[in-house]
Structures are given as structure tokens and as C-alpha cells.
Amino acid sequence: MAASESKESPANNPGLHTTIDEATKGYFMQQTMFRIKDPKVSLDFYSRVLGMSLLKRLDFPEMKFSLYFMGYEDTTEAPSNPVDRTVWTFAQKATIELTHNWGTESDPEFKGYHNGNSDPRGFGHIGITVDDTYKACERFQNLGVEFVKKPDDGKMKGIAFIKDPDGYWIELFDRKTIGNVTEGNA
């Protein structure tokens, strides 16, 4: 890697296009989806533990599933008309779609969903920025949240990983120290 080139430069990232296609100018990351076993448990976690709001709920009775869109938006600004509320929800950035297939919450045979962190590996985690990783983790500990990694565990100090009720991993880092955590790799 050339010293004058940043790690983000096209010279250091074969395949990276520098001219963004005009047709994609309005695109943005809107959501990621988790399949959940029990909406009562997951909604409690994402709202009470992580502080998200329910932006929109969509039910599909014919197909027996519901979608719960969670995010950090101020819902007092959301339209009350159901169609307008859906349009508003899909205009928000970085939301989580919780998908519940009806009946899984009471099915004793249901084993849960694969979170991507065991073989075969795939999806890994989502990331949440917090004001202070240590204070957030102390709160999560008091709430009984399961940890994958606490802030001082392992080689990367100051970041943590928790699990949601379905075993999906959530990385936690704070905006004040994330630059220091990744400094040697920047």
C-alpha cells in the first residue's frame, strides 16, 4: 500500500468504483431483518433495553406473519394515517425489521433461528452507538442481558457484544472512544 494512499482509496481496494452511478444517488441502507420467536420478548428487549421505538407494525394474516420495524426515530413526528406511516417508516435510515412467523412463540418443537456466528458462519452482528460503553454495559448487566464480550475482554478494549432474545449479536461502541479502539487499524 502506498504511503500517500489512504486505506479507503481505490488503489487499495480493487473492485471499488469511484464514480457512483447517478441511478443510485437516492439509495440508502434502510433496514436489516431478524426472524424472532416471540414478539412480546423481542419488543421488550428492543424498546426497554435498547431504547428503540416501534415505527410500524404490519400484519399479513394470509401468510401468518407480522413485521415490527424498530428504530431510534422520534415517533411523535410519524403520520397517524396507516399508509403515510408506512411510507414514513421506509424513509428512515438504519431500522431493524423483526419478523415473527405466527406460532413459533408457543411451539415446543421450535429450536430458534441461526444467528450466523456458528458454522456455517454468515451474518455476524449489528452495531449500536452508545454514549458510554461501560455505563451501557453496567445497565445491561443489571437488566440481565447476556454478554458475548464485555468491554475489557479480549484484545479490542472498549467495545462489547450482547445477545438479543433470539441470540443475535449486537456490538456496542461509543462515539468518543471508537477511534482509539481501532487506531492501530485505521
From Swiss-Prot:
Entry binding sites for substrate: Q31, R35, N101, R121, H125, K155, M156
Keyword Cytoplasm among record annotations: no
Free-text cofactor note: Binds 1 zinc ion per subunit.
CC cofactor: Zn(2+)
Pathway assigned in UniProt: Secondary metabolite metabolism; methylglyoxal degradation; (R)-lactate from methylglyoxal: step 1/2
A single GO molecular function term of this UniProt record: lactoylglutathione lyase activity
Top-level taxon of the source organism: Eukaryota
InterPro entries according to UniProt: Glyas_Bleomycin-R_OHBP_Dase, Glyas_Fos-R_dOase_dom, Glyoxalase_1, Glyoxalase_1_CS, VOC
Chemical reaction(s) catalysed: (R)-S-lactoylglutathione = methylglyoxal + glutathione
Enzyme class, broadest EC rank: lyase
Keywords, ordered alphabetically: Lyase, Metal-binding, Zinc
Gene3D superfamilies reported in the protein's UniProt record: 2,3-Dihydroxybiphenyl 1,2-Dioxygenase, domain 1 (3.10.180.10)
Annotated EC: 4.4.1.5
Active site: E171
Keyword match Cytoplasm: no
Similarity section: Belongs to the glyoxalase I family.
Its job: Catalyzes the conversion of hemimercaptal, formed from methylglyoxal and glutathione, to S-lactoylglutathione.
Name this protein carries in UniProt: Lactoylglutathione lyase
